[in-house]
């Protein structure tokens, strides 16, 4: 068996011979986490059985379970953790009934995953990468010195292999584990967003935006940190690899370098892929929100407005409208439903005018401007045209009029100032504060 890995059959046989197994329901897992937190607060790291019973009682209170026979149930839970090699029990004839307990490496690893490993930030990643860079730098310097002095295998194992194996590789594994925790965090955020949108999407839009932006920012910040250090780390690994090329007795270092390069590539690659996947999900959520808003606008708001009109005399209200022609649509629909004749005349500002007629009028006016340009060589001031035209239409038509004029202006020509990169000044085009930023069209 090589020193850097184990084969699958060997690992299977090893686990089978030792009868490894894990069975941690929520209550047992919470008990283990409580033990780990309590253990961190102690200086000696040792716990008595009475301490564990008190911890068990506290966790059962959180689950609102009965405290009957609490000592027996706590003893059963402790024995299960000992059997699964999560706790070690130490006792002797001198300490009968006063056993001492310590968390095993497995217990520390499981609790560490749920407690400390979730504290993942760009600062922590930067510190880890800084430590890795220092270790690889020392290893590469030692490798070059070993080549110059023709050092023995013992030198290479102590000064090159050991730092890479027991420091760099473990930090890479820690970063990889942190990325997998970030994957879980993304899934939990997706579930939270789905739950928010299912319950009340109107109130949840701001919360969804915050969750999406925070996650996108975290992923981008972490990936930028990885990209900044990745190339330098790869260069140092290549320095070490160049030193062991052709040295059959140092095959274990060459193989370790290859493994580290693969780990680093995988970490950086998955970081970028996670960002791309999250961007796709972000777009999907925004599309869903836009669709939901459109559906609500057509379905809920119109029904609410009809009910308000129907009960107007019982509950009077004021109506502020931004598009007056919508009242005409509502009036026509009511007339069809009731099959009654509408009496009276609409105010002038509510008279219906088709968009095609409006378009033809504006096109005709723009053609007149072209004739003036051809005869007098007079440029077209788009802001002045917009201001003059908007004065002839009600406020409800201003957006459509402005859109048609701008569309026609783009077809007519362009401004020389556009090519020079000069930004035009903002010009007011109506009394409601609307402004436009456009150069004078002087090139056709």
From Swiss-Prot:
Gene name of the encoded protein: mukF
Designated name of the protein: Chromosome partition protein MukF
Gene Ontology, cellular component aspect: cytoplasm; nucleoid
One biological process term in Gene Ontology: chromosome condensation
Subcellular location: Cytoplasm, Nucleoid
Family: Belongs to the MukF family.
InterPro entries assigned: Chromosome_partition_MukF, MukF_C, MukF_C_sf, MukF_M, MukF_M_sp, MukF_WHTH, WH-like_DNA-bd_sf, WH_DNA-bd_sf
One Pfam family named in its UniProt record: KicB
The protein's role, per its UniProt record: Involved in chromosome condensation, segregation and cell cycle progression. May participate in facilitating chromosome segregation by condensation DNA from both sides of a centrally located replisome during cell division. Not required for mini-F plasmid partitioning. Probably acts via its interaction with MukB and MukE. Overexpression results in anucleate cells. It has a calcium binding activity.
Subunit structure: Interacts, and probably forms a ternary complex, with MukE and MukB via its C-terminal region. The complex formation is stimulated by calcium or magnesium. It is required for an interaction between MukE and MukB.
Region (Leucine-zipper): 212-240
Keywords, alphabetical: Calcium, Cell cycle, Cell division, Chromosome partition, Cytoplasm, DNA condensation
GO terms for MF: calcium ion binding
Native species: Haemophilus influenzae (strain PittGG)
